[in-house]
Amino acid sequence: MQSLENGRWLNEPTKAEASNTELSVTTDANTDFWRETHYGFVRDSGHFYAFQAQRDFTAQVRIQAQFKNLYDQAGLMVRLNERQWVKTGIEFSDGYGLLSSVLTNETSDWATGRYDSDPSDFWIRVTVQSGVLRIQASYDGRTWPLVRLCPFPEADHYLVGPMCCTPERAGLEVRFSEWRLGRALGKELHDLS
């Protein structure tokens, strides 16, 4: 595990506390990351606790939260700038905690799928390597099925870290722990470890 003390906030929440082992956040009202698609608006107000990563990396974190309102969300973000980023994790929609990923390259897309385990306690992993983004989720921190595989812009470095938003309210309490950031794991696509 690595320390969660030295991240840098984009849109620091009113209530947040970072220690060596965990980051606790309570979301502010009307926070979100989105660009244009369907809704026609741009929002760059979500909470993002960023660490710098080199060209090829893997990051993962455990997330605990009680998602209950529409669009409550928490997970990881990888960001180049306000127009090129991805956020992924659990997002509450249509009465369920869904596995969600939003890939943005000028405009946002949104891909979701049902999460069959407990959405209040999960792990999310992102790997960026050679222009490819791989997202995996886990219910136990040991088995990591694929959520998404897609192109992602190559860069010398990225910002990556915990992300949470509540577009419709304030007050989602999120605990991030078991943070890891390092070189890309380089595993085969169907290696779920």
PLM region spans:
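Extracellular glycan-recognition regions
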Residues: 1-193
